[in-house]
Amino acid sequence: MSVSSNDPEQRNGRGMASGNNVDMSLYPPFIKQLDAKLPDYTREGDIEYPFEEITGVGDENRIRGNWSNKSDYLLAVIGFTAGVGSFWKFPFLVFQHGGAAFLVPYLCMLCLASLPMFFMEMVLGQFSSSAAISVWKVVPLFKGIGFAQVTISGFFAVFFNIISAWTLFYLINSFSFSIPWSNCANSWSGENCTLGTRIQCKEMNGTLLVNGSCIVEHASSNETTVIPLHDLGSIPSLKYFHNDVLMLSKGVDDFGTLNWYLGLCVLACWIAVFLCLFQGVKSSGKVVYVAVIVPFIILTVLLTRLLTLDGSLAAVFYFLTPKWEILMDLHVWGEAAVQAFYSVSCCSGGLFTIASYSRFHNNIYKDIWLVLIVDVIVSLVGCLLTFSAIGFTCYEFAISLDKFHIRDGFHLVFVFLAEALAGVSVAPLYAGLFFIMILLVVHATQMFVVETIVSSICDEYPERLRRNRRHVLTTVCALFILLSIPFCLSSGLFWMELLTQFVLTWPLVVIAFLECMAINWVYGVDNMLDNAKWIVGYWPPCYIFWKILFKFICPMVYLAILCFLWLDWNSIQYESYQFPYWSILTAWCIASFPLILIPIVGIWQFCIAKGTITQKWWRVLYPDDAWGPAMAIHRAEKFPLQIPEARRLLLPPEVEIASSRGVLQEEMPMSYDYNTSSAADVRSNRSTGHGATDVRSVAATNNTIPKFERETAI
């Protein structure tokens, strides 16, 4: 039917005559009623002014903001994912499990456990321009996952802040002619402080044997004494960490005193985070140039220096010599799966947040592979750095590599690597560089963890809080300063161990499984991949592989990781100290708290949904009407009739359009299978090479709808 009039005055307020039937193919399949009660445009709403010309200059989304450029965005993702785990966990696993052979299960699990979740969170965050809570408009019943992620991000914020404070404490004390932990002549050294075997034997004017013993000749009696030096006491870096930095108490129930110097470091780190986030992604996007690029430069300098030390090359060759028999050990595969899952910081909400500030049509496929490759490279370079230090330490203590044992976590960074750097010439310089690198790496991660919390809160309540973002940031930082104070007590290390072993481990895997089921089974894997196509313009390569991976392999992998974590769990201890039962029970309760929010919020969403019981289930299992691109110009690329201004352009009053499904969405029977229908549409889209509901394709085939151009303005 031809269009005889385009006069907007002849139409009603929503651009359509009453009584007309509308082709529902121009609506998203989850819109449940004709007009969807779309609100008019406001500056604090979720939809930007429609059809605004996009030139690539300035913010695309002027309400929420965007990254200033692509490099800001990429460095932010790299800074968030390539964290301190590349220096204190991955090298330990490689050393314990067959050297380079461990890379085989690690890379396999990286593709099966990390890549799918990384892809999914980046796509949904960029597609909806929403942070961790608001993104769950996609499946309102599972909105509690967003609250759980924000809660876990709060734990991460405190955790990384304490690590930053410890690092800052070390950094400040590195600015001296002789770093404190290089010798035992200190008040905190204690009785069992032991220097390196070669140094100690040299001080006694002895001769070092191959087995690590020292022969000392006594001039007065012409006798010799053999001393097994490497069996003595503790190295000074461990004494320094326990007695000076932490003022460590006897146990978790012995709170001790507050370390005021450490408390000031905590305050300084939180002030730094506040200043970096004060202007949102505009300021944090500039900080990452220092927080991400400088650590790479320092890492190169440190690696070059350590490779020149005695014994370092032997350890590197030890690393490069694979022990293939470990591939038959299921425990090694379990460790690789756990490390691969945590290596890209999935399921804490940070990836949703970072991706939400990128431009809508940013090519996310290339970004995902680039970030994963950089993450692997950083982990490998971290391994080389650690193995070089191991070789040098074994040389100093006259211990063979096969008999050398290290601990992961805090000990690897603050004890072992600190001890290795203390033996290098010009030690204060290299120790200072090392702790600057660790401080910047941890700060970059903490910065975006806090940004996740702030953005999630502001996105969930935009009318009240988006204009007052700085007030939200101030409140969040002040709250976390108070929560960080208990970790500055003498028992702080024990609580950090509990936090590491319980709160920041298995709850993330539970969230990953629920998130995977909600997106790939409830929302539909086809719809998620269609969102990716909407962003980039083409389907991800190997579409069938991705579909099988998301829908079937990922849930099984996450369940396997969860079972491994629970079955492999042993009674937690720190050195010889056994944690009491009540502290472990407390840690379990804290770890379970974020997960309890998921059913609570789900029940709340069901209760506030309107309609009968069946209609309530319909509303909480299907995407909210507001789900989709944040800007109207992007929504209008496929569903122009969802935008009031577009309806005034596209629908003259006399046009008679029939529903494509024969019934309106509000009259749709509750037995209608949304996922099946949309999946069929998606498969049709793939076969034709374009979206079935793309406005340009509709305009070309339907004479009743005028051609819509992206640059059209009202």
UniProtKB/Swiss-Prot annotation:
Body wall, and vulval and enteric muscles. Residues 1-74, 605-714 are cytoplasmic. GO terms for molecular function: acetylcholine transmembrane transporter activity; amino acid:sodium symporter activity; L-amino acid transmembrane transporter activity; neurotransmitter:sodium symporter activity; PDZ domain binding. Its main location: membrane. Glycans are attached at N192, N205, N211, N222. Residues 173-257 are extracellular. GO terms for biological process: acetylcholine transport; choline transport; glycine import across plasma membrane; neuromuscular synaptic transmission; neurotransmitter uptake; positive regulation of locomotion; sodium ion transmembrane transport. It is found in: Cell membrane; Postsynaptic cell membrane. Keywords: Cell membrane, Glycoprotein, Membrane, Neurotransmitter transport, Postsynaptic cell membrane, Symport, Synapse, Transmembrane, Transmembrane helix, Transport. It is a multi-pass membrane protein. The chain crosses the membrane at residues 75-95, 100-120, 152-172, 258-278, 287-307, 336-356, 368-388, 422-442, 476-496, 502-522, 548-568, 584-604. GO terms for cellular component: plasma membrane; postsynaptic membrane. Residues 1-21 are annotated as: Disordered. It comes from the Eukaryota. InterPro entries: Na/ntran_symport, SNS_sf. Interacts with stn-1; part of the DGC. Belongs to the sodium:neurotransmitter symporter (SNF) (TC 2.A.22) family. Mediates sodium-dependent uptake of acetylcholine at neuromuscular junctions during periods of increased synaptic activity, may also prevent spillover to adjacent synaptic sites. Not involved in the uptake of other neurotransmitters (GABA, glycine, proline and glutamate) and there was also no inhibition of uptake by adding an excess of other candidate substrates (GABA, glycine, taurine, creatine, proline, alanine, carnitine, glutamate and betaine). This is Sodium-dependent acetylcholine transporter. It comes from Caenorhabditis elegans. The gene is snf-6.
